[in-house]
Amino acid sequence: HLEQEGCRTRVTVVPPGFDFQELYVDSRNSLPPSVLSWLASRRGCPVIAQVGMLRPEKGHEFMLNLLFHLKMNGRQFCWLIVGSGSPELREHLQYQIDSMGMHDDVFIADNVFPAAPVYRVASLVVLPSENESFGMVLAEASAFSVPVVATQIGGIPEVIQNNQTGTLLPAGNKHAWMCALNDFFNDPGRFYQMARLAKQDIEERFDINKTVLKILTLAKHK
């Protein structure tokens, strides 16, 4: 596409970098008391975390419907939603949660900054977005060896290798997502094995020092 537009210069893509040491230090911060209290009341249940702004394209309603069906099938879990958005959207989502009788299973924590402590308590991180340019949440979760399940769209496949370092699924495909979530409940060990590989991969490819070095090298040879 760039060549068609007349660009003849070689283009090099440098991925964003993460200061993993700072991320690990941030994870030692305490979660808000409201989150800790809710988690204590749900002790023993797997914590499914979704981190990101409350926007229609982030798939919160899609995820809620999936988890409702899982609950009807006897699955026990707690879904921790981390992220802020418009008051109207939050109110609508909370209304749906209450209407489905999911108020004990779902907690909207609003903005938690830094978000790193969330990964210390998460059993699984989900990202059912319809549109995602990169998926930094997946890289952060992987740094803590937390299994991830996400949509195979946008820049997400640049972060997660399907069935190797995580699970990628078609956006909006209820059957595929239900199967993947049931697989996690039935065989979490397989997902944690991928998560351990993801940690190694993410720290190798997205370390901030390597990113800076690549940029400096490109600038030097420009």
Question: Where are each of the predicted segments found?
Answer:
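Aromatic "clamp/platform" in nucleotide-sugar-dependent glycosyltransferases that forms part
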Residues: 111, 130
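Short hydrophobic beta-strand element within catalytic cores of glycosyltransferases
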Residues: 147-150, 160
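Nucleotide-activated donor-binding/catalytic signature segment of Leloir-type glycosyltransferases, i.e.
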Residues: 92-110
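A short, well-ordered alpha-helix in the C-terminal region of glycosyltransferases
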Residues: 46, 176, 183, 190-205, ...
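A conserved mid-protein helix/loop that constitutes part of the nucleotide-sugar donor-binding site
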Residues: 46, 50-69, 91-92, 167, ...
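Conserved acidic donor-binding segment of nucleotide-sugar-dependent glycosyltransferases
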Residues: 162-163, 167-174, 183-189
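A short helix/loop element that forms part of the nucleotide-sugar donor recognition site in Leloir-type
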Residues: 24-41
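A short, active-site helix/loop in glycosyltransferases that binds the activated sugar's phosphate group
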Residues: 1-13, 18-22
